[in-house]
């Protein structure tokens, strides 16, 4: 997608999109706009990687901003209307007439009291106001007089109209500054004859001030003679609405819910990309993620509440700093968080400001336009109450909502053990005994006693279901009768709610002690007891709501089980033998009773959202099958969408495998999975896939039980060891700490990123586990996903069994799905969620392998898959056929990926320095081009280019050949052969062998053609600058050499198609000398550009990547003679890599010795006289030499010096080191 900002207008709303939208994104935004504008609910499925989160954010926020824009326009229009109403002539009703006359009289008195005012202006103003009052009085008299209008003379009616026109004309003149001398006194006297006016005038003369004080009362009263009464009523309603909504109608907030906090972090990263990144936002999270107190590491919820209550006299100092970051303006303008932020940024800011991030995020919700939170914050009524979340007339978006049914059922359910109930009972009993809020605690104590006694009575009625597990189930009506016997009814439950609210409320009591106030905090119940009581009352609230409407949706189950606990081993005081000290505790099996209130209808909890929210949007990549959401949630989704994927069908391999490598049928039912044949066949299949597909592979199993069985079997047979030889094998843990899980994930990512002897990693996980939900395995992190079987829920689970029976019971009257169909849908959603871990963006590719014969034999299992998966699925009857197809797919995609990595690199911009790292052009033909200066260009011919008509400086294109010669053979002629050849060489040979071949190729080039020096060499020599490399470790130097090798290898793989390498590379003697010199020169430029230790800066000449052009081989006649024998070696100071005391080792004698050796090598004579320059060195000197030799391989010397004879180099450097050391040694040691 392009990075250019795109603009779309959908539903009358302008949407700014950060890139060109996919068709699926446009379809999603269209559906969301329809739902928001029409207040309808949406059910939208878009495959993972199709950009649904971006579409959700941009469309919802654009709609919200459009409402703010409309609100601003309405406010401006209202102001204009009010201004127009103020300019209109005053109302002619009695109340306004009296107010107008009083205002006139007051103004007359003010004008009379002002002596300096001009008389003409005063008279005009007074006359003007008086005339207006008189006209209003006359009009009022026409309404109040007993005479009919038909009996009035025509002259008076015409006179009235004339006066109105005259007064209007005068008002306009007054506004222009014109002054009048009124001569219509006779007319004024005629108007005074009206009785109504005389009465009002007399009253104003007698008590002017009282009339002014009473004018407001008359003007505020209702009036039936004009429209002002209706206007006042509307104004009162508007003012009331403004007061209720905070001075202006509120724009709906957007509550964006996801399943985990990690998904919230991904959403905020997407929001940062958009044009709406500066939106006012907040993230609601738990104390576990936001607490910044350094002394609290565990049980943060309880410890936070204790610090807030300050039971030990010390309160939380971070809580008192919330005001530093509790407003949106503070974040944006003072602290610089002006774009979408993550919860980690808020926590970091809280630590810096010593302010609580948990309470700051809650305070920021008041002014936020979009609120991010896990969606159980929206479904659970207790969390909504504690977080003060109001969803009335708000927009609710639930992403990754494929598990929303299960989450809704869990939020309306409650479970507790008999031990928890007895703990709450004893604590309440203690409160009553100490006389603390006795009237409120006693009813709650009675409830706890009743439940614990009932559990003890029913313990003998339990029915055994399996080994050491018994239970009994009651339906809604039965449990209501049981609660009625306990005294908990529709009438008494509201009173119990009042008692619970009173006991959990904090209270302080002030007493006087020795004349001083003493504040005593009244004790409250512990958080554990409060949690038990609140959960119990939550269920009771649903049971008694709306005349027991949801009673049939509940089942109450009492279960008996056994668990192992660690109990301290207390020695017997009367015991004769002493026990060992190391024996601290003993494990003991105890019986546990669990009371479960299970909600079987998700619509119970979801009804709070559907009845209050303006629009609900459910979206996920795996909503299919979508038919159950409307019936299960009790919400009509008027807008539904099932979008297509954005990838091409060639980027994904989807196949079903029904047989293993040995031909055994694979059907992952409970009976088959218990056999060793099935377990061995699955292991052999997984091993073959690991050998075929490189990088990361995910394998999903139906349950943790099956995972443990397979691991034990494979460890016994040695297959687990075989898997570890190919890939790093990681197993998903069941439960455990979050930090441990994150470490395992990081281990998996690192094994793929830093591949050594092993080719990636294998992660074996479980459907519905942590790995299958919301984690991003893009690109190499998941090149294949293997699913074994169909992850049906445990059919023996009591809750699953009750849910199936419930659906069968209410399928006809409520439209629910039958129990068997609901059971299958749960399996499909879990399977689709696991398959969605692969293919995370448009350019991604991967294989989806479904291992189970049921997919091939029964088509109904294919219909449950996502739309984009079932369109591409292929059935393979044998494993060999599937493996061949998978191998071909993997090779093709790897070749395409390598080609796209070359094609997708950015072209270098104009003016790029030659010292920067070169990037590949958009074609597979790679050529390094030397841009000569004007002095050199006169010896060259211009290069013809068929791809560009823009005139460019003369250039000489120099392709690579040393690497290709080192890797052997004739150059491949097409891209596929080049890439496959390089891939095989790279995997077959280690890095050491590649470096050896590189040095050999340069050695050949140097030994054969070192005497042929051209003007290019002189030019580079004259412009080369020496630079001092920085000191680095051997590991860094090795990585730099690998960078150089990769650059040269990429040039080899690309230059093979240029056509200029059609000659055999094994015949070096037939290659043109000038061409080989050009090759050496290009390699020199590569070493300068690729290895960051060296900086070959040239002001006029630089090496850069240019578009492909025809190769022009420079002829000898085009180049001037080179009369200089000086070497063009790029000088670097090797002493920086020696010890601190070994500085300044190079001397004039060493240079002479080097020149003599070079002359001998250039003349082709054997180097036999170098022994005269060599001295014996110690072990320390040999180590120093090895360091310098390694640096020379990395580019410390000229490209030609890489091929220098090793024996000559060793003796030469030994001589240099020994001589320099002798110079630096004190004469005391030399004597």
Curated annotation (Swiss-Prot):
Residues 890-903 have a biased composition (Polar residues). A motif (Nuclear localization signal) lies at residues 155-173. ATP binds at residues 46-53. Belongs to the DEAD box helicase family. DEAH subfamily. DNA-dependent helicase and 5' to 3' DNA helicase required for the maintenance of chromosomal stability. Involved in the repair of DNA double-strand breaks by homologous recombination. Involved in the repair of abasic sites at replication forks by promoting the degradation of DNA-protein cross-links: acts by catalyzing unfolding of HMCES DNA-protein cross-link via its helicase activity, exposing the underlying DNA and enabling cleavage of the DNA-protein adduct by the SPRTN metalloprotease. PANTHER family: DNA REPAIR DEAD HELICASE RAD3/XP-D SUBFAMILY MEMBER, FANCONI ANEMIA GROUP J PROTEIN. This is Fanconi anemia group J protein homolog.
């Amino acid at each position: 997608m392009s990075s250019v900002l795109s603009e779309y207008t959908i539903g009358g709303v302008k949407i700014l999109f950060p890139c060109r939208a996919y068709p699926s994104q446009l379809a999603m935004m269209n559906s969301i706009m329809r739902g928001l504008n029409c207040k309808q609910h949406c059910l939208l499925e878009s495959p993972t990687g199709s950009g649904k989160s971006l579409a959700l954010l941009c469309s919802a926020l654009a709609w919200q901003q459009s409402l703010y824009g409309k609100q601003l326009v309405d406010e401006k229009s209202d102001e204009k209307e009010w201004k127009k109403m103020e300019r209109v002539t005053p109302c002619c009703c009695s109340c306004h007439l009296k107010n107008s006359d009083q205002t006139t009289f007051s103004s007359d008195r003010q004008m009379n009291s002002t002596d300096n005012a001009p008389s003409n202006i005063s008279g005009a103003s007074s006359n003007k106001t008086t005339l207006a009052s008189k006209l209003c009085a006359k009009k009022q008299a026409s309404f109040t007089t007993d005479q009919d209008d038909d009996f009035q003379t025509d002259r008076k009616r015409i006179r009235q109209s004339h006066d109105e026109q005259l007064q209007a004309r005068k008002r306009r003149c007054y506004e222009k500054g014109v002054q009048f001398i009124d001569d219509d006194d006779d007319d004024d006297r005629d108007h005074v004859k009206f009785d109504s006016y005389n009465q009002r005038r007399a009253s104003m003369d007698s008590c002017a001030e009282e009339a002014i004080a009473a004018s407001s009362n008359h003007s505020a009263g209702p009036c039936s003679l004009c429209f002002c009464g209706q206007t006042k009523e509307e104004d009162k309603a508007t003012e009331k609405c403004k007061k209720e909504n905070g001075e202006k109608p509120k724009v709906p907030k957007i509550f964006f819910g996801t399943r985990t906090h990690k998904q919230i972090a991904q959403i905020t990263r997407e929001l940062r990309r958009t044009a709406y990144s500066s939106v006012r936002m907040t993230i609601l999270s738990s104390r576990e993620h936001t607490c910044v107190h350094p002394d609290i590491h565990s049980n943060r919820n309880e410890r936070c509440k204790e610090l807030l209550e300050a039971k030990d006299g010390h309160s939380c100092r971070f809580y008192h700093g919330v005001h530093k970051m509790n407003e949106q303006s503070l974040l944006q303008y003072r602290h610089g968080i002006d774009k979408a932020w993550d919860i980690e940024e808020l926590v970091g800011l809280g630590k810096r400001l010593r302010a609580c991030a948990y309470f700051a995020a809650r305070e920021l919700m008041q002014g936020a336009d979009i609120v991010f939170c896990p969606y159980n914050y929206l479904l659970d009524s207790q969390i909504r109450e504690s977080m003060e979340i109001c969803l009335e007339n708000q927009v609710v978006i639930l992403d990754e909502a494929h598990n929303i049914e299960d989450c809704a059922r869990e939020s309306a359910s409650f479970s507790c053990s008999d031990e928890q109930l007895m703990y709450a009972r004893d604590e309440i009993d203690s409160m009553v005994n100490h006389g603390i809020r006795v009237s409120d605690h006693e009813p709650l104590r009675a409830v706890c006693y009743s439940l614990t006694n009932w559990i003890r009575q029913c313990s003998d009625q339990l029915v055994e279901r399996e080994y050491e597990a018994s239970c009994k189930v009651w339906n809604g009506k039965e449990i209501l009768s049981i609660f009625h016997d306990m005294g908990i009814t529709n009438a008494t439950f509201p009173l119990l709610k009042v008692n619970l609210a009173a006991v959990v409320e904090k209270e302080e009591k002030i007493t006087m002690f020795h004349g001083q106030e003493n504040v005593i905090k009244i004790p409250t119940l512990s958080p554990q007891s409060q949690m038990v009581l609140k959960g119990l009352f939550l269920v009771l609230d649903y049971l008694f709501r709306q005349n027991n409407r949801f009673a049939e949706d509940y089942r109450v189950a009492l279960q008996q089980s056994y668990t192992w606990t660690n109990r301290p081993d207390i020695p017997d005081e009367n015991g004769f033998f002493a026990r060992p000290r190391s024996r601290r505790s003993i494990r003991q099996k105890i019986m546990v009773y669990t009371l479960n209130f299970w909600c079987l209808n998700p619509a119970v909890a979801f009804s709070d959202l559907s009845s209050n929210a303006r629009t609900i949007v459910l979206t996920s990549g795996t909503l299919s099958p979508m038919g159950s959401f409307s019936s299960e949630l009790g919400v009509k989704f008027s807008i539904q969408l099932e979008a297509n994927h954005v990838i091409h069908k060639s980027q994904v391999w989807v196949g079903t495998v029904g047989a293993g490598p040995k031909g055994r049928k694979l059907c992952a039912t409970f009976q088959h999975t218990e056999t060793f044949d099935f377990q061995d066949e699955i292991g052999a299949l997984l091993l073959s896939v690991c050998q075929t597909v490189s990088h990361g592979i995910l394998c999903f199993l139906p349950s943790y039980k099956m995972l443990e069985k397979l691991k034990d079997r494979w460890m016994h047979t040695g297959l687990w060891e075989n898997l570890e030889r190919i890939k790093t094998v990681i197993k998903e843990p069941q439960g455990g700490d979050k930090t441990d899980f994150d470490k395992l994930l990081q281990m998996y990512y690192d094994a793929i990123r830093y591949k050594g002897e092993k080719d990636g990693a294998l992660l074996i996980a479980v459907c519905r586990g942590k790995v299958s939900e919301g984690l991003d395995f893009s690109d190499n992190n998941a090149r294949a996903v293997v699913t074994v079987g169909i992850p049906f829920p445990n059919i023996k689970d009591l809750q699953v069994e009750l849910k199936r029976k419930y659906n069968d019971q209410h399928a006809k009257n409520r439209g629910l799905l039958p129990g068997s169909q609901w059971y299958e849908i749960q399996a499909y959603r879990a399977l689709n969620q696991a398959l969605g871990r692969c293919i995370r963006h448009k350019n991604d590719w991967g294989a989806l392998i479904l291992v189970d014969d049921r997919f091939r034999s029964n088509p109904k299992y294919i219909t449950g898959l996502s739309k984009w998966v079932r369109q591409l699925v292929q059935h393979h009857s044998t494993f060999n056929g599937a493996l061949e197809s998978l191998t071909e797919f993997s090779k093709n995609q790897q070749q395409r990926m390598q080609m796209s990595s070359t094609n997708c690199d950015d072209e270098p911009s104009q003016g790029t320095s030659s010292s920067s790292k070169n990037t590949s052009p958009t074609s597979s033909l790679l050529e390094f081009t030397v841009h000569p200066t004007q002095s050199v260009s006169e010896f060259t011919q211009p290069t013809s280019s068929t791809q560009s008509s823009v005139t460019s400086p003369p250039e000489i294109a120099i392709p690579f050949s040393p690497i290709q010669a080192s890797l052997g053979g004739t150059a491949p002629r097409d891209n596929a052969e080049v890439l496959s050849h390089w891939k095989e060489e790279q995997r077959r040979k280690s890095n050491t062998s590649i470096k050896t071949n590189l040095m050999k190729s340069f050695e050949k080039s140097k030994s054969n053609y070192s005497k042929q020096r051209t003007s290019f060499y002189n030019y580079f020599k004259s412009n080369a600058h020496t630079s001092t490399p920085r000191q680095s470790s051997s590991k860094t130097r090795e990585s730099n050499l690998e960078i150089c090798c990769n650059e040269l290898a990429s040039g080899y793989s690309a230059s093979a198609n240029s056509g200029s390498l059609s000659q055999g590379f094994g015949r070096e003697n037939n290659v043109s000398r000038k061409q080989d010199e050009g090759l050496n020169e290009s390699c020199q430029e590569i070493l300068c550009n690729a290895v960051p230790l060296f900086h070959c800066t040239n002001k006029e000449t630089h090496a850069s990547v240019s578009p492909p052009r025809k190769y022009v081989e420079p002829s000898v006649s085009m180049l001037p003679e080179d009369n200089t024998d000086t070497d063009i070696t790029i000088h670097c100071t090797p002493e920086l890599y020696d010890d601190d005391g070994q500085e300044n080792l190079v001397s004039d004698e060493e240079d002479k010795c080097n020149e003599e050796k070079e002359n001998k090598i250039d003349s082709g004579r054997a180097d036999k006289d170098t022994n005269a320059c060599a001295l014996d060195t110690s072990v320390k000197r040999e180590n120093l030499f090895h360091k310098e030799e390694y640096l020379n391989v990395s580019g410390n010397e000229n490209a030609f010096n890489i091929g220098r004879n090793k024996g000559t180099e060793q003796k030469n450097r030994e001589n240099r080191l020994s001589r320099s050391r002798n110079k630096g040694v004190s004469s005391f040691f030399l004597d």
